């Protein structure tokens, strides 16, 4: 009877040892940890915003390129245009933009409905125009880091950040 009990204890000890050793020395453990580490590192980057400014004293004209999402915002004469990716859905043969002005922001806050418009001017055309005139060098580059809690990392948060800090001009004179 004692030998059976010792055999059971020995088998349990061996099983526990195997479970612990497999957990600590899993053949894919290093690859799994590397994948998780890489994923966590990509979440810590945040975003950066390239600002091209062609403003004059009479009017505001700025282009914002938000990376890594490649979102294009265009601020012209107290209106911010946000180029949407779903251009062909809303506007056949044209490009869809959401417009932000003081009045449309109030409407968005009250109803949750965004004002969209169609335009024949593509975001690529705007980028080429500004990059050519500025020799492909932005006037400012903002680095918004998630670690410092500057943004919560959604496009609307970045738009709010740009408006709040005065990069986007929506105020009527």
Curated annotation (Swiss-Prot):
Signal peptide location: 1-21
Subcellular location per the Swiss-Prot or TrEMBL entry: Virion membrane; Host cytoplasm; Host nucleus
Major place of residence: virion
Keywords, sorted A to Z: Host cytoplasm, Host nucleus, Membrane, Signal, Virion
Keyword Signal: yes
One protein family per Pfam: Baculo_19
GO cellular component entries: host cell cytoplasm; host cell nucleus; membrane; virion membrane
Protein purpose: Per os factor that plays an essential role in the initiation of host midgut infection. May form a specific complex with PIF1, PIF2 and P74 to bind host receptors.
Family, per entry: Belongs to the baculoviridae 19 kDa protein family.
Protein name from the UniProt record: Per os infectivity factor 4
Biological classification of the source: Viruses, Viruses incertae sedis, Naldaviricetes, Lefavirales, Baculoviridae
């Amino acid at each position: 009877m004692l030998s059976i009990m010792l055999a059971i204890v020995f088998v349990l000890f061996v099983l526990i040892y195997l479970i612990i050793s497999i957990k600590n020395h899993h053949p894919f453990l290093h690859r799994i940890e590397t994948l998780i580490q890489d994923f966590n590192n990509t979440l810590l980057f945040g975003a950066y915003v390239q600002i091209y400014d062609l403003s004059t004293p009479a009017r505001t004209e700025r282009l914002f390129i938000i990376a890594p999402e490649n979102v294009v915002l265009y601020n012209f004469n107290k209106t911010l245009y946000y180029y949407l990716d779903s251009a062909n859905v809303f506007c056949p043969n044209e490009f869809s933009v959401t417009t932000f002005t003081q009045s449309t922001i109030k409407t968005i806050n009250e109803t949750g409905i965004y004002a969209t418009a169609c335009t024949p001017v593509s975001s690529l055309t705007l980028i080429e125009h500004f990059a050519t005139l500025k020799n492909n060098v932005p006037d400012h580059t903002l680095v918004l880091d998630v670690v410092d809690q500057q943004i919560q990392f959604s496009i609307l948060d970045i738009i709010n950040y740009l408006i709040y800090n005065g990069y986007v001009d929506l105020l009527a004179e």
